[in-house]
Swiss-Prot record:
This is Fluoride-specific ion channel FluC. Na(+) is not transported, but it plays an essential structural role and its presence is essential for fluoride channel function. It catalyses: fluoride(in) = fluoride(out). GO terms for biological process: cellular detoxification of fluoride. GO terms for cellular component: plasma membrane. It is found in: Cell inner membrane. One of its GO terms (molecular function) is fluoride channel activity. Keywords: Cell inner membrane, Cell membrane, Ion channel, Ion transport, Membrane, Metal-binding, Sodium, Transmembrane, Transmembrane helix, Transport. It is a multi-pass membrane protein. Fluoride-specific ion channel. Important for reducing fluoride concentration in the cell, thus reducing its toxicity. It comes from Rhizobium etli (strain CIAT 652). Belongs to the fluoride channel Fluc/FEX (TC 1.A.43) family. PANTHER family: FLUORIDE EXPORT PROTEIN 1-RELATED (PTHR28259:SF1). The keyword Transmembrane applies.
């Protein structure tokens, strides 16, 4: 039961933070492109690289901490399902180039962010 609570707690915090990042991006960049979703996915991928290195390898942290931070917090913060909907919406609006750029940027930058997060933490070892 405590494990489910930790996932829920982390998810709640991550979801609220995702909401605020989305609102910030909307105010800053406008509604024409899903900047908020792109930002949380890239940042979330970097953070999961950092957490994976710290929690799993460096500190051999408890399963509870992994559930709170990775499954809960990052599960609530990152938004792959929202990414998919945003991409389809761009295509449905006839913005195929923007849709393609969005998909390529999301996948490419997210993969680069995970690699960067791992590399940063490994360099600090």
């Amino acid at each position: 039961m405590i494990q489910a609570f930790l996932v829920a707690l982390g998810g709640a915090i991550g979801s609220v933070l995702r909401y605020y990042v989305g609102q910030w991006a909307l105010r800053l960049m406008g509604p024409a492109f899903p900047w908020g979703t792109l930002a949380v996915n890239v940042v979330g991928c970097f953070v999961i690289g950092v957490f994976a290195e710290l929690i799993a390898r460096r500190f051999n942290a408890s399963m509870e901490l992994r559930l709170l931070l990775i499954t809960g917090f990052l599960g609530g913060f990152t938004t792959f399902s929202a990414f998919s909907l945003d991409a389809i919406s761009l295509f449905e609006r006839g913005e195929a180039v923007a849709g393609g750029i969005y998909i390529a940027a999301s996948v490419g930058l997210s993969m680069a962010a995970v690699i960067s997060g791992l590399a940063v933490m490994r360099a600090l070892a």
